[in-house]
Structures are given as C-alpha cells and as structure tokens.
C-alpha cells in the first residue's frame, strides 16, 4: 500500500528526500494566507524559489516563469506547458515548467477529434485509444462553487496535477510538494498509487490536506506530531 506524510514545517528546515517535486509556490501577489506574507521583496522571493529541489515541476504565472524562475534555478527549464482557463480577471493562464525532468505526452491520450478521417478510423481499429495530449491544457480553475474547493485561497485543480504526474513521474517515484497547501498534489499522487510527502507551514491547511487524502481510501501511514 502506498503511503503519505504531511509535515507541518517549512521545507527549508527539512532534509528533502529524493523524488519528483510538483508544486505551486506562493505567487508573491499578496494573497491572503493564514501564516504567510505573500509579498516579499523580489530578491527574497527569488531566494525562496531557489530552494525548491530539482527535479521539479513548478506552476506559476507567465511573467514570473519567464523572468524569475530562471534566476532562481540558475538554468533554463526543459519544457513548458500552458494551462489556460476562463477568468474574469486579466490573468487567464499559468505556465507549468519542468526543471531537470521532461513530460512524455504520449502517456496520456485525448479523444480523436475527426472520427471521419480514414487514418483516425484505422488507428481506432488498431486499438489506439486517442491522440497524445498537447502542451496546451484547458482546465477550469477552482471556483467557490467547485466540488474540489477547500478553505485554501489558491487551489490548483486536481486534473492539472494528475496530468503532470501521469506524463512525468517514473514508476515508484516519490512525489513531493514543498508548498503543500490544501494537499492537492499529495491527494492525486496517493490516488495514482505513489508515495507522497507534503510540506506545509500552516497547521490548518495540513489538517485539510490530511482529511482530503484520507478520503481517498484507508490511509497508508501513521501520523506523527510533525506530520499531524
């Protein structure tokens, strides 16, 4: 049985094990978190991002992905996926950047679009289930009326994390989130059969994450003081 661990600490104070980090860091946009001031000086913010271990997949707004992440990582990313969504604000997309790892889009398929095309019909006859997904993902944001919605102010849709894991993670690889939030990364990883660790400084969000993961099925780990 796979296991999960929720650690109520700043990841910078911990020894991070080897694994694939999938995370959406605080965006430095002055979001209202319980125990974190989301408005650092640029240099301090870059320093925070630089502590994210590689290999990693980082979800961020386009400006920060282009301008700040290369400074923090001291390199260029291997691949970028654009995640787009409908929004009433000016921000209608985020970039998913891959550092020290690369997605294999053939691992996830989408339905064929032109079912009258002879080539498509032949592929279906050959047992193909669909076309590989693109590097452009249209997935709705989590809104207040969304079934997935928790008390966390900035929540990533489970489908975004699911595609990242399915296209990028190796079999048996440990999935890590260093900005755990409401536990979406660990919940999806746990559902998919991966062992997972989530680091989060806010005990309230840790408790939300724990309940979400335990709702999948019987939890696979005992919970200590550090892991709530």
What are these regions (language model features)?
Residues 209-210:
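Conserved SAM-binding loop
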Residues 213-228:
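Class I S-adenosyl-L-methionine-dependent methyltransferase module
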Residues 2-199, 204-206:
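Core catalytic lobe of class I
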């Amino acid at each position: 049985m796979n296991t999960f661990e929720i650690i109520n600490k700043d990841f910078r104070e911990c020894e991070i094990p080897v694994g694939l980090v999938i995370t959406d860091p605080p965006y430095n946009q002055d979001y209202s978190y319980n125990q974190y001031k989301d408005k650092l000086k640029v240099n301090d913010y870059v320093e925070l991002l630089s502590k994210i271990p590689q290999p990693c997949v980082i979800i961020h707004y386009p400006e920060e992905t282009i301008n700040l992440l290369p400074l923090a990582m001291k390199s260029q990313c291997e691949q970028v996926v654009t995640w787009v969504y409908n929004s009433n604000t000016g921000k209608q997309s985020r970039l998913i950047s891959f550092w020290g790892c690369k997605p294999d889009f053939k691992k996830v398929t989408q339905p064929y679009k032109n079912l009258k095309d002879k080539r498509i019909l032949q592929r279906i006859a050959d047992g193909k289930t669909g076309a590989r997904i693109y590097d452009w993902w249209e997935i709705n944001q989590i809104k207040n009326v969304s079934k997935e919605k928790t008390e966390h102010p900035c929540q990533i849709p489970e489908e975004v994390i699911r595609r990242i894991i399915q296209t990028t993670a190796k079999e048996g690889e440990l999935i890590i989130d260093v900005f755990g939030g409401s536990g979406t990364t660990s919940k999806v990883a746990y559902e998919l059969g991966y062992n997972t660790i989530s680091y989060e400084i806010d005990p309230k969000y840790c408790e939300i994450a724990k309940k979400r993961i335990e709702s999948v099925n019987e939890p696979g780990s005992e919970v200590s003081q550090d892991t709530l």
